[in-house]
Design a protein with these regions (language model features):
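Catalytic phosphate/metal-binding cores of nucleic-acid and nucleotide-processing enzymes, i.e., regions
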Residues: 1-119
């Protein structure tokens, strides 16, 4: 059965809203309008961050809630929309966990920065 466009958009919007809520839950010093889910069909990042939010969460988020994800085209879209920020692809499918993907080298850089700040 093929999913209608409206249903697919609602499914994607639910993931965007969930990611927005998780970021706000993790960084409780942020205000609700520091992290916003974009309108479906808008170009650019799926979760918009204020400068205050960006300092805590330096990622450009692209959300995909699809049963069959083309990982390579999704990563390309994520990188295109990221601009100067760190591209982060967040994805899930029905009844699955939510996963996040970023370039491995960038992950190592972030871990290195984190270890330097804790020394």
């Amino acid at each position: 059965m093929v999913m209608k466009t409206r249903s697919a958009n609602n499914k994607g919007k639910r993931l965007q809203n969930n990611i927005r809520d998780l970021i706000l839950e993790k960084f409780q010093q942020l205000e609700e309008d520091d992290v916003r889910s974009t309108t479906m069909g808008d170009s650019g990042e799926d979760v918009l961050l204020s400068p205050a939010a960006r300092r805590l969460f330096p990622f450009a988020v692209e959300c995909k809630n699809q049963e069959k994800l083309n990982i390579w085209s999704s990563l390309e879209q994520t990188e295109t929309n990221a601009g100067k920020h760190i591209p982060l692809l967040v994805f899930k499918r029905n009844r699955s966990k939510t996963y996040a993907v970023l370039e491995f080298g960038k992950l190592l850089e972030l871990l290195d920065e984190d270890s330097e700040s804790t020394q």
